[in-house]
Amino acid sequence: MKIKSLFISVAALWSLSFGCHAALAADMPTFKDAVKGLKGAAENAVQKQMDKLSPDAMANANKAFEAASKELYPKAQKEGSLVVYTVWDVEHVKAVTDEFMKRYPGIKATYWQARNPELVTRALTEFKGGQSSADIILSDNAPSILRAAGAMTDYETVQKDVLILHDPAIPTVSMQIQALTYNTKKIKPADLPKSWEAVANPKYKGLVALDDPMRAGPLSSMLAAHKTQWNDDARFARFIRGLKALNVPVHKSTSAMFRLVIAGEYAIAMPALLHDVIHEMGKGTPVDYVRESPPVVFPRQAGIFGKAPNPNAAMLFAEWLISEHGQTVIDSIGRETVRKGFTSKTSVENAYPKGTKPFPVTDKLFLEDPKKWLDVNVKPIWEG
Protein backbone atom coordinates (compact mmCIF):
# COMPACT_ATOMS: atom_id res chain seq x y z
CA MET A 1 0.00 0.00 0.00
CA LYS A 2 1.25 3.49 -0.78
CA ILE A 3 0.05 6.84 0.50
CA LYS A 4 1.53 10.04 -0.89
CA SER A 5 3.68 12.55 0.96
CA LEU A 6 3.47 12.29 4.75
CA PHE A 7 2.51 8.66 4.93
CA ILE A 8 4.84 5.71 5.17
CA SER A 9 4.12 2.39 3.52
CA VAL A 10 2.78 -0.12 6.04
CA ALA A 11 5.02 -3.17 6.15
CA ALA A 12 4.04 -6.79 6.59
CA LEU A 13 3.47 -7.22 10.30
CA TRP A 14 4.06 -10.03 12.77
CA SER A 15 1.68 -12.63 14.09
CA LEU A 16 -0.88 -10.26 15.65
CA SER A 17 -1.77 -8.90 12.27
CA PHE A 18 -5.23 -9.47 10.90
CA GLY A 19 -3.70 -9.62 7.42
CA CYS A 20 -4.92 -6.23 6.38
CA HIS A 21 -3.37 -2.79 6.03
CA ALA A 22 -4.53 0.60 7.23
CA ALA A 23 -5.53 2.90 4.41
CA LEU A 24 -6.78 6.46 4.12
CA ALA A 25 -8.83 8.35 1.59
CA ALA A 26 -7.26 9.46 -1.66
CA ASP A 27 -7.40 13.16 -0.84
CA MET A 28 -4.68 13.02 1.83
CA PRO A 29 -2.95 16.41 2.13
CA THR A 30 0.52 17.06 0.84
CA PHE A 31 2.94 19.39 2.63
CA LYS A 32 5.56 20.54 0.13
CA ASP A 33 9.11 19.81 1.20
CA ALA A 34 7.97 18.78 4.71
CA VAL A 35 8.74 15.14 4.12
CA LYS A 36 10.76 13.84 1.15
CA GLY A 37 9.44 10.70 -0.46
CA LEU A 38 8.11 7.60 1.16
CA LYS A 39 9.78 5.62 3.92
CA GLY A 40 9.76 1.88 4.49
CA ALA A 41 8.43 0.08 7.54
CA ALA A 42 8.34 2.31 10.59
CA GLU A 43 11.21 2.10 13.03
CA ASN A 44 10.48 2.40 16.71
CA ALA A 45 11.03 5.39 18.95
CA VAL A 46 14.61 6.56 18.54
CA GLN A 47 16.28 8.99 20.91
CA LYS A 48 17.43 12.20 19.31
CA GLN A 49 20.39 14.11 20.66
CA MET A 50 19.68 16.10 23.81
CA ASP A 51 21.70 19.04 22.56
CA LYS A 52 20.40 22.59 22.60
CA LEU A 53 17.77 23.29 19.98
CA SER A 54 19.06 25.71 17.38
CA PRO A 55 16.95 28.78 16.57
CA ASP A 56 16.82 27.69 12.93
CA ALA A 57 15.45 24.26 13.83
CA MET A 58 12.77 25.82 16.01
CA ALA A 59 11.82 28.36 13.36
CA ASN A 60 11.66 25.68 10.66
CA ALA A 61 9.47 23.46 12.82
CA ASN A 62 7.11 26.35 13.55
CA LYS A 63 6.87 27.17 9.84
CA ALA A 64 6.23 23.53 8.99
CA PHE A 65 3.47 23.37 11.59
CA GLU A 66 1.81 26.54 10.30
CA ALA A 67 1.91 25.17 6.74
CA ALA A 68 0.44 21.87 7.89
CA SER A 69 -2.23 23.62 9.93
CA LYS A 70 -3.18 25.88 7.02
CA GLU A 71 -3.60 22.92 4.70
CA LEU A 72 -5.28 20.50 7.11
CA TYR A 73 -7.73 22.81 8.89
CA PRO A 74 -10.16 23.43 5.99
CA LYS A 75 -10.35 19.70 5.30
CA ALA A 76 -10.74 18.93 8.99
CA GLN A 77 -13.56 21.49 9.19
CA LYS A 78 -15.38 19.64 6.42
CA GLU A 79 -15.02 16.43 8.40
CA GLY A 80 -16.31 18.29 11.44
CA SER A 81 -15.38 15.75 14.09
CA LEU A 82 -12.48 14.19 15.96
CA VAL A 83 -12.76 11.00 18.03
CA VAL A 84 -9.98 10.26 20.52
CA TYR A 85 -9.43 6.90 22.24
CA THR A 86 -7.12 7.44 25.20
CA VAL A 87 -5.72 6.21 28.49
CA TRP A 88 -5.09 9.76 29.70
CA ASP A 89 -7.02 10.95 32.74
CA VAL A 90 -10.44 12.30 31.82
CA GLU A 91 -9.65 15.78 33.14
CA HIS A 92 -6.46 15.82 31.08
CA VAL A 93 -7.97 14.73 27.79
CA LYS A 94 -10.90 17.11 28.32
CA ALA A 95 -8.53 20.03 28.85
CA VAL A 96 -6.55 19.13 25.74
CA THR A 97 -9.55 18.61 23.44
CA ASP A 98 -11.25 21.76 24.74
CA GLU A 99 -8.19 23.83 23.83
CA PHE A 100 -7.98 22.15 20.44
CA MET A 101 -11.61 23.07 19.70
CA LYS A 102 -10.95 26.68 20.71
CA ARG A 103 -7.97 26.81 18.38
CA TYR A 104 -9.86 25.15 15.52
CA PRO A 105 -13.56 26.11 15.59
CA GLY A 106 -15.83 23.85 13.60
CA ILE A 107 -14.25 20.59 14.77
CA LYS A 108 -16.15 18.76 17.51
CA ALA A 109 -13.79 16.62 19.58
CA THR A 110 -15.07 13.70 21.65
CA TYR A 111 -13.19 11.01 23.53
CA TRP A 112 -13.44 7.57 25.09
CA GLN A 113 -11.16 6.78 28.03
CA ALA A 114 -10.06 3.33 29.18
CA ARG A 115 -7.05 1.35 30.33
CA ASN A 116 -4.62 0.12 27.69
CA PRO A 117 -5.90 -3.49 27.55
CA GLU A 118 -9.50 -2.40 27.01
CA LEU A 119 -8.48 0.27 24.51
CA VAL A 120 -6.42 -2.17 22.44
CA THR A 121 -9.15 -4.82 22.51
CA ARG A 122 -11.85 -2.40 21.39
CA ALA A 123 -9.72 -0.79 18.69
CA LEU A 124 -8.64 -4.15 17.25
CA THR A 125 -12.20 -5.46 17.28
CA GLU A 126 -13.46 -2.37 15.47
CA PHE A 127 -10.61 -2.46 12.99
CA LYS A 128 -11.21 -6.12 12.20
CA GLY A 129 -14.91 -5.40 11.79
CA GLY A 130 -14.22 -2.55 9.37
CA GLN A 131 -15.69 0.07 11.69
CA SER A 132 -14.64 3.67 11.16
CA SER A 133 -14.65 4.62 14.82
CA ALA A 134 -11.63 6.31 16.38
CA ASP A 135 -9.39 8.87 14.71
CA ILE A 136 -6.58 9.13 17.26
CA ILE A 137 -5.11 6.64 19.71
CA LEU A 138 -3.63 8.79 22.49
CA SER A 139 -1.65 6.48 24.74
CA ASP A 140 1.75 5.02 25.54
CA ASN A 141 1.76 1.27 24.81
CA ALA A 142 -1.38 1.06 22.68
CA PRO A 143 -0.25 2.75 19.42
CA SER A 144 2.75 0.47 18.93
CA ILE A 145 0.74 -2.65 19.77
CA LEU A 146 -1.98 -1.62 17.32
CA ARG A 147 0.60 -0.80 14.66
CA ALA A 148 2.05 -4.30 15.00
CA ALA A 149 -1.44 -5.65 14.37
CA GLY A 150 -1.81 -3.55 11.21
CA ALA A 151 -4.42 -1.28 12.76
CA MET A 152 -2.60 2.04 12.47
CA THR A 153 -1.65 4.30 9.58
CA ASP A 154 1.96 5.46 9.65
CA TYR A 155 2.40 9.22 9.83
CA GLU A 156 5.53 11.29 10.41
CA THR A 157 5.15 14.71 11.98
CA VAL A 158 6.54 17.72 10.15
CA GLN A 159 7.98 18.89 13.49
CA LYS A 160 10.22 15.86 14.02
CA ASP A 161 13.44 17.88 14.34
CA VAL A 162 12.36 19.47 17.63
CA LEU A 163 11.40 16.22 19.38
CA ILE A 164 13.45 14.57 22.11
CA LEU A 165 11.91 11.22 21.13
CA HIS A 166 10.84 10.65 17.55
CA ASP A 167 9.10 7.71 15.92
CA PRO A 168 8.79 8.11 12.13
CA ALA A 169 5.46 6.27 12.11
CA ILE A 170 3.61 7.56 15.20
CA PRO A 171 3.78 11.17 16.46
CA THR A 172 5.25 11.37 19.97
CA VAL A 173 3.46 14.15 21.85
CA SER A 174 4.56 13.60 25.45
CA MET A 175 6.80 11.34 27.51
CA GLN A 176 6.60 9.23 30.59
CA ILE A 177 9.68 10.22 32.61
CA GLN A 178 10.69 7.88 35.41
CA ALA A 179 12.64 9.33 38.32
CA LEU A 180 14.52 7.49 41.08
CA THR A 181 12.50 8.86 43.98
CA TYR A 182 12.78 8.74 47.76
CA ASN A 183 11.16 9.96 50.97
CA THR A 184 13.49 12.58 52.46
CA LYS A 185 12.48 11.62 56.02
CA LYS A 186 13.14 7.91 55.55
CA ILE A 187 16.64 7.87 54.08
CA LYS A 188 19.69 10.10 54.46
CA PRO A 189 21.29 11.69 51.37
CA ALA A 190 24.54 9.82 52.02
CA ASP A 191 22.69 6.50 51.92
CA LEU A 192 20.86 7.09 48.65
CA PRO A 193 21.41 4.86 45.61
CA LYS A 194 23.08 6.92 42.89
CA SER A 195 21.71 4.86 40.01
CA TRP A 196 18.80 2.58 39.15
CA GLU A 197 21.17 -0.39 39.27
CA ALA A 198 22.28 0.49 42.79
CA VAL A 199 18.73 -0.01 44.11
CA ALA A 200 19.33 -3.76 43.77
CA ASN A 201 21.97 -3.56 46.53
CA PRO A 202 21.03 -5.82 49.49
CA LYS A 203 21.35 -2.87 51.88
CA TYR A 204 18.02 -1.57 50.55
CA LYS A 205 16.17 -4.76 51.42
CA GLY A 206 12.76 -3.88 52.81
CA LEU A 207 13.07 -0.19 51.89
CA VAL A 208 11.95 -0.26 48.27
CA ALA A 209 8.43 0.09 46.87
CA LEU A 210 8.78 -2.11 43.79
CA ASP A 211 6.58 -2.01 40.73
CA ASP A 212 5.61 -5.44 39.39
CA PRO A 213 8.17 -6.12 36.64
CA MET A 214 5.84 -8.56 34.88
CA ARG A 215 2.83 -6.25 34.46
CA ALA A 216 4.21 -4.27 31.49
CA GLY A 217 4.24 -1.13 33.62
CA PRO A 218 6.96 1.45 34.33
CA LEU A 219 9.44 -1.01 35.86
CA SER A 220 9.01 -3.27 32.84
CA SER A 221 9.85 -0.43 30.48
CA MET A 222 12.79 0.53 32.70
CA LEU A 223 14.15 -2.99 32.33
CA ALA A 224 13.75 -2.78 28.56
CA ALA A 225 15.64 0.52 28.51
CA HIS A 226 18.50 -0.85 30.61
CA LYS A 227 18.80 -4.02 28.56
CA THR A 228 19.28 -1.88 25.46
CA GLN A 229 21.57 0.60 27.22
CA TRP A 230 23.84 -2.02 28.75
CA ASN A 231 23.84 -4.63 26.00
CA ASP A 232 25.11 -7.02 28.66
CA ASP A 233 22.91 -10.03 29.45
CA ALA A 234 24.86 -11.03 32.55
CA ARG A 235 24.60 -7.54 34.04
CA PHE A 236 20.89 -7.42 33.17
CA ALA A 237 20.27 -10.76 34.87
CA ARG A 238 22.16 -9.65 38.01
CA PHE A 239 20.01 -6.53 38.18
CA ILE A 240 16.77 -8.51 38.07
CA ARG A 241 18.00 -11.05 40.61
CA GLY A 242 19.09 -8.21 42.87
CA LEU A 243 15.63 -6.63 42.72
CA LYS A 244 14.00 -9.96 43.50
CA ALA A 245 16.36 -10.46 46.44
CA LEU A 246 15.05 -7.26 48.04
CA ASN A 247 12.19 -9.50 49.11
CA VAL A 248 9.49 -6.84 49.01
CA PRO A 249 5.91 -7.05 47.70
CA VAL A 250 5.39 -5.91 44.12
CA HIS A 251 2.72 -3.37 43.24
CA LYS A 252 0.24 -3.16 40.37
CA SER A 253 -0.19 0.62 40.42
CA THR A 254 2.65 3.13 40.22
CA SER A 255 0.52 5.93 41.66
CA ALA A 256 -0.64 3.79 44.61
CA MET A 257 2.95 2.70 45.19
CA PHE A 258 4.11 6.31 45.19
CA ARG A 259 1.51 7.17 47.82
CA LEU A 260 3.03 4.51 50.07
CA VAL A 261 6.42 6.19 49.72
CA ILE A 262 4.84 9.56 50.52
CA ALA A 263 3.28 8.00 53.63
CA GLY A 264 6.68 6.72 54.74
CA GLU A 265 5.92 3.02 54.41
CA TYR A 266 8.86 2.75 52.02
CA ALA A 267 11.94 4.90 51.54
CA ILE A 268 12.48 4.46 47.79
CA ALA A 269 10.11 4.23 44.80
CA MET A 270 11.21 1.94 42.00
CA PRO A 271 10.14 3.89 40.02
CA ALA A 272 7.98 7.03 40.33
CA LEU A 273 6.88 9.38 37.56
CA LEU A 274 8.65 12.72 37.46
CA HIS A 275 5.52 14.85 37.09
CA ASP A 276 4.02 13.25 40.23
CA VAL A 277 7.23 13.83 42.18
CA ILE A 278 7.59 17.47 41.19
CA HIS A 279 3.91 18.09 41.92
CA GLU A 280 4.31 16.70 45.44
CA MET A 281 7.56 18.58 46.01
CA GLY A 282 5.70 21.78 45.17
CA LYS A 283 3.21 20.98 47.94
CA GLY A 284 5.97 20.48 50.48
CA THR A 285 5.66 16.70 50.56
CA PRO A 286 8.90 15.07 51.85
CA VAL A 287 9.93 13.50 48.56
CA ASP A 288 12.76 14.18 46.13
CA TYR A 289 14.56 12.38 43.31
CA VAL A 290 18.15 11.40 42.54
CA ARG A 291 19.40 13.73 39.85
CA GLU A 292 22.57 11.72 39.21
CA SER A 293 20.47 8.83 37.94
CA PRO A 294 19.41 9.44 34.31
CA PRO A 295 15.66 9.29 33.80
CA VAL A 296 14.01 6.53 31.81
CA VAL A 297 11.82 8.01 29.07
CA PHE A 298 8.95 6.28 27.32
CA PRO A 299 6.98 7.78 24.41
CA ARG A 300 3.38 8.87 24.77
CA GLN A 301 1.93 9.04 21.31
CA ALA A 302 -1.00 10.24 19.23
CA GLY A 303 -1.29 7.65 16.48
CA ILE A 304 -3.62 7.76 13.47
CA PHE A 305 -6.09 4.86 13.62
CA GLY A 306 -6.23 2.76 10.47
CA LYS A 307 -9.97 3.24 10.04
CA ALA A 308 -10.00 6.91 11.02
CA PRO A 309 -13.25 8.51 9.76
CA ASN A 310 -11.69 11.98 10.10
CA PRO A 311 -8.04 11.57 9.04
CA ASN A 312 -7.37 15.26 8.42
CA ALA A 313 -8.65 16.18 11.88
CA ALA A 314 -6.52 13.38 13.31
CA MET A 315 -3.34 14.66 11.67
CA LEU A 316 -4.14 18.23 12.66
CA PHE A 317 -4.66 17.17 16.28
CA ALA A 318 -1.35 15.29 16.36
CA GLU A 319 0.55 18.23 14.86
CA TRP A 320 -1.13 20.71 17.21
CA LEU A 321 -0.19 18.62 20.26
CA ILE A 322 3.48 18.85 19.24
CA SER A 323 3.30 22.59 18.48
CA GLU A 324 4.36 25.14 21.09
CA HIS A 325 0.69 25.83 21.88
CA GLY A 326 -0.12 22.15 22.30
CA GLN A 327 2.95 21.53 24.46
CA THR A 328 1.95 24.46 26.66
CA VAL A 329 -1.44 22.85 27.21
CA ILE A 330 0.15 19.47 27.94
CA ASP A 331 2.48 21.13 30.44
CA SER A 332 -0.41 22.96 32.08
CA ILE A 333 -2.14 19.68 32.98
CA GLY A 334 1.04 18.34 34.56
CA ARG A 335 2.17 16.00 31.79
CA GLU A 336 5.70 15.91 30.47
CA THR A 337 6.51 17.71 27.25
CA VAL A 338 8.57 16.21 24.44
CA ARG A 339 9.65 19.29 22.55
CA LYS A 340 13.32 20.27 22.82
CA GLY A 341 13.99 23.65 24.38
CA PHE A 342 10.51 23.85 25.91
CA THR A 343 10.71 25.40 29.38
CA SER A 344 8.87 23.20 31.85
CA LYS A 345 9.28 22.03 35.43
CA THR A 346 9.08 18.44 34.24
CA SER A 347 11.32 18.68 31.18
CA VAL A 348 14.51 16.61 31.25
CA GLU A 349 16.50 19.73 30.41
CA ASN A 350 15.11 21.57 33.44
CA ALA A 351 14.84 18.75 35.98
CA TYR A 352 18.27 17.16 35.46
CA PRO A 353 21.85 18.43 35.22
CA LYS A 354 23.04 19.79 31.90
CA GLY A 355 24.18 17.03 29.59
CA THR A 356 22.05 14.31 31.17
CA LYS A 357 21.27 11.61 28.62
CA PRO A 358 17.99 9.83 29.35
CA PHE A 359 17.57 6.09 28.89
CA PRO A 360 14.95 5.79 26.12
CA VAL A 361 12.74 2.73 25.66
CA THR A 362 13.42 1.72 22.06
CA ASP A 363 13.26 -2.08 22.06
CA LYS A 364 11.03 -3.02 19.11
CA LEU A 365 9.58 -6.17 20.62
CA PHE A 366 8.85 -4.48 23.94
CA LEU A 367 7.03 -1.61 22.27
CA GLU A 368 4.92 -3.91 20.10
CA ASP A 369 4.35 -6.83 22.49
CA PRO A 370 5.54 -6.10 26.04
CA LYS A 371 4.14 -9.37 27.40
CA LYS A 372 6.12 -11.42 24.92
CA TRP A 373 9.26 -9.40 25.66
CA LEU A 374 8.81 -9.97 29.40
CA ASP A 375 8.18 -13.68 28.92
CA VAL A 376 11.43 -13.98 26.97
CA ASN A 377 13.73 -11.63 28.87
CA VAL A 378 12.46 -11.21 32.43
CA LYS A 379 10.19 -14.09 33.46
CA PRO A 380 12.87 -16.83 33.37
CA ILE A 381 15.02 -14.76 35.76
CA TRP A 382 12.30 -13.25 37.95
CA GLU A 383 10.35 -16.48 38.40
CA GLY A 384 13.28 -18.87 38.06
Regions found by a protein language model. Name each.
Residues 36, 44-50, 66-77, 87-108:
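Short, polar/charged alpha-helical segment
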Residues 345-384:
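Extracellular/periplasmic bilobal clamshell ligand-binding domains
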Residues 143-148, 267-286:
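A ligand-binding cleft/hinge motif common to bilobed small-molecule-binding domains
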Residues 70, 83-98, 109-127, 132-265:
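Extracytoplasmic ligand-binding site segments that recognize negatively charged/polar headgroups
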Residues 162-165, 175-176, 203-214, 239-244, 250-251, 321-344, ...:
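Periplasmic-binding protein-like
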Residues 179-186, 223-227, 298-313, 329-330:
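A bilobed periplasmic-binding-protein/Venus flytrap-type ligand-binding module shared by bacterial periplasmic
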Residues 96, 235-239, 300, 309-321, ...:
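Short amphipathic alpha-helical coupling segments at ligand-binding clamshell hinges
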